[in-house]
C-alpha cells in the first residue's frame, strides 16, 4: 500500500490474519500493472518486481523453513505451558481490534493481556457511542469463552491525537497531557467507555486497565469513578458481571504506591516499553538517545524485580506486556522475577511457550540475581545466552541434522538448507545469521576439502548449540574453483567453544583422508547409522 502506518486498521487486520503487507511503497500501482510477478517480504520490507530464479528459489526454501517451524510448535497451541519444574504460565496476546480475538486464540493465546481500545476512537470525527463500544468489547469476551481478557482504557495524548479532541500542542507529549490525565476534562468520553466496559462484563469476566497512572490520588479517583458507574448501571437495572480494576505500571513512581494501591485495585500490568523509557529518561523514538532505551540494563531489571515483589506482597495480580515479553532471551529473567502472565504479539506466543518448557524457575531466580549484578546490558546478554545453552543442552550430532540424498542446484542452496535446518532444530538464533557467518568464512578461502567433500564452518555468538550437520546430494554440486562435491559436512560452533571447534575439525579432516570412511558416509542409507558412525569416529 502507498499509505498507512503501524496503527492503521488495514495494517492491524493484515498482521492479525497473517497477510503480508508493506506500507509507504511509492509507485506501487505502476508495479502491479507492469510486473508479471511481484515478490513481497514484509519481514524485511522488500518488494521485488519480476524476481529471478535464484531469488524465487531462496524464498521457496524460506517458506519451507517457516512451515517447519510452525509445524514444530503447533502442538503447543492447545496447551497451557509450564516450566520444567511445574510453574504454570499464561501466555496472552496483544490486540487492537475486536476482530483479532478469534485469530489469536486459534494461534495458542491463553487470553488477551492487552486490548488497546484506541483504534475504536481514532480515524473518525466523533467518538464511538456506548453501544458501539459495548458491541466491540462483547465480541472479544464472547470469543474468549471465559479466558482472561484485559481491556485498556483510552490511551490518547499529544503524540497520538484524535480528530475530535482539542488537545494542546506539547513540546514533550510523552511527559504531558495524556491517558488518565485527560479523563477529568473529557469526562463524558471516559464515562461512556466505563459504562460500555461494565455492561460487557455481563458477557464475560473483564479486567479493566488504566494507563499512565502516576499517583495514589489518580488511583483513588479511578476507583470512585468506576464504583459510581457500576452503581448507576444497577440503578438503571442494566446487568453487570465480574470485573476487576487495574493499572499499567509504566511510571516509576508506582513502585512505591503498590501497597496502598491494593486497597483500590485488583491487578497491575507492567508496560515495559514506557517504563524503560521513563526510568532511563530517554525517548525511544529519538535516534540520538535510542541506545539508552535498553530493557536489559541491570538497573531496569532490578526495578522490574522490585515491582513484581511489591505487587505480589500486596496481593495484587501482576502481568507484563510490551516488547520485553516477546524477547525469548529475556524469558528466563522474567521467570526469575516471578512473573507468570506475559502478553505479547501473537507471532511470539509459540516461541515463548517452547522456551518456557525448558526453563527451571529456581535456576532462573539465581540467574536474575546474577544479571542484576552485571555492569552492562552486554554482560547480561552473555550471561543469559550461557544459561540458555546449559538449560537446553543438545548433543553436537543428532540424526535430525542429517539431510540425505537431496536434490540441490547450487552451493548457496546447500548452505541455506543446512543453516535453515539449524534454526528449525533450535540450535541457532536464526538461520540467516548462521548463514552469514558461514559465508564470511567462505570469503576467506573455499572449504572444499577434495574427495567430493566440503566442510563449511563458522564460530559465532549466534550459534546456541555447537553442531555437526551433513548434507548428501544426489548429483555433484559445484563448490567453486572447479571443484564438485557430493557430501557437505557443516560445523557450526559457539564462539565460546573455539578449542572444541578445532578438535572436531582436525579429527574430521583426518578421517576424511580415508576412503573407507568416505565410502561409508556415501553408502549408508539410514540417518541413525551415519550418526553412530560419526559419533564413534570423532569420539563425540
Residue map of PLM features:
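Acidic, glycine-rich flexible loop/linker segments
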Residues: 1-109
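Fold-independent oxyanion-binding glycine-rich loops
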Residues: 2-4, 25, 41-43, 50-52, ...
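Histidine-centered active-site/metal-ligand motif
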Residues: 8-9, 312, 457, 501
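A generic structural motif
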Residues: 38, 214, 493-497
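Conserved alpha/beta-domain cores
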Residues: 70-392
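Cytosolic covalent-transfer regions centered on His/Cys nucleophiles
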Residues: 382-540
Amino acid at each position: 500500500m502507498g499509505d498507512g502506518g503501524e496503527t492503521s486498521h488495514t495494517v492491524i487486520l493484515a498482521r492479525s490474519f497473517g497477510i503480508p503487507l508493506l506500507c509507504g511503497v511509492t509507485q506501487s500501482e505502476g508495479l502491479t500493472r507492469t510486473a508479471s510477478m511481484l515478490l513481497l517480504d514484509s519481514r524485511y520490507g522488500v518488494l521485488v518486481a519480476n524476481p529471478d530464479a535464484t531469488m524465487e528459489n531462496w524464498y521457496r526454501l524460506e517458506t519451507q523453513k517457516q512451515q517447519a517451524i510452525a509445524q514444530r510448535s503447533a502442538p503447543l497451541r492447545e496447551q497451557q505451558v509450564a516450566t520444567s519444574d511445574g510453574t504454570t504460565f499464561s501466555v496472552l496476546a496483544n490486540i487492537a481490534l475486536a476482530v483479532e480475538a478469534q485469530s489469536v486464540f486459534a494461534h495458542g493465546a491463553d487470553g488477551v493481556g492487552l486490548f488497546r481500545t484506541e483504534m475504536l476512537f481514532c480515524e473518525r470525527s466523533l467518538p464511538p457511542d456506548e453501544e458501539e463500544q459495548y458491541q466491540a468489547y462483547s465480541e472479544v469476551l464472547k470469543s474468549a469463552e471465559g479466558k482472561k481478557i484485559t481491556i485498556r482504557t483510552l490511551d490518547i495524548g499529544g503524540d497520538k491525537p484524535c480528530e475530535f479532541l482539542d488537545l494542546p500542542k506539547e513540546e514533550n507529549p510523552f511527559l504531558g497531557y495524556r491517558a488518565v490525565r485527560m479523563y477529568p476534562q473529557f469526562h463524558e468520553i471516559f464515562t461512556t467507555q466505563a459504562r460500555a466496559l461494565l455492561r460487557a462484563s455481563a458477557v464475560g469476566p473483564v479486567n479493566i486497565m488504566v494507563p499512565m497512572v502516576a499517583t495514589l490520588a489518580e488511583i483513588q479517583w479511578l476507583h470512585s469513578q468506576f464504583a459510581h458507574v457500576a452503581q448507576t448501571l444497577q440503578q438503571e437495572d442494566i446487568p453487570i458481571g465480574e470485573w476487576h480494576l487495574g493499572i499499567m505500571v509504566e511510571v516509576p513512581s508506582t513502585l512505591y504506591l503498590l501497597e496502598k494501591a491494593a486497597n483500590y485495585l485488583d491487578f497491575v500490568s507492567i508496560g515495559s516499553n514506557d517504563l524503560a523509557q521513563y526510568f532511563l529518561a530517554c525517548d525511544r523514538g529519538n535516534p540520538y538517545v535510542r541506545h539508552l532505551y535498553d530493557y536489559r540494563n541491570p538497573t531496569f531489571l532490578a526495578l522490574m524485580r522490585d515491582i513484581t515483589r511489591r505487587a505480589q506482597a500486596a496481593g495484587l495480580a501482576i502481568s507484563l506486556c510490551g516488547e520485553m515479553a516477546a524477547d525469548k532471551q529475556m524469558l528466563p529473567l522474567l521467570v526469575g522475577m516471578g512473573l507468570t502472565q506475559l502478553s505479547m504479539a501473537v507471532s511470539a506466543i509459540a516461541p515463548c511457550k517452547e522456551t518456557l518448557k525448558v526453563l527451571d524457575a529456581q535456576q532462573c531466580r539465581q540467574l536474575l540475581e546474577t544479571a542484576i549484578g552485571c555492569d552492562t546490558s552486554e554482560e547480561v546478554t552473555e550471561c543469559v545466552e550461557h544459561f540458555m545453552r546449559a538449560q537446553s543442552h543438545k548433543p553436537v550430532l543428532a540424526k535430525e541434522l542429517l539431510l540425505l540424498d537431496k536434490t540441490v542446484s547450487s552451493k548457496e542452496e546447500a548452505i541455506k538448507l543446512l543453516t535453515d535446518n539449524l534454526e528449525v532444530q533450535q540450535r541457532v538464533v536464526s538461520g540467516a545469521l548462521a548463514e552469514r557467518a558461514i559465508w564470511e568464512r567462505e570469503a576467506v578461502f573455499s572449504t572444499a576439502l577434495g574427495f567430493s567433500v566440503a566442510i563449511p564452518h563458522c564460530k559465532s555468538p549466534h550459534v546456541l548449540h555447537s553442531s555437526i550437520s551433513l548434507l548428501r546430494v544426489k548429483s555433484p554440486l559445484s563448490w567453486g574453483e572447479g571443484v564438485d562435491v557430493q557430501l557437505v559436512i557443516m560445523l557450526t560452533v559457539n564462539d565460546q567453544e573455539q578449542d572444541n571447534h578445532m578438535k572436531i575439525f582436525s579429527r574430521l579432516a583426518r578421517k576424511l583422508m580415508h576412503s573407507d570412511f568416505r565410502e561409508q558416509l556415501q553408502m549408508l542409507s539410514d540417518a541413525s547409522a551415519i550418526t553412530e558412525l560419526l559419533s564413534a569416529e570423532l569420539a563425540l
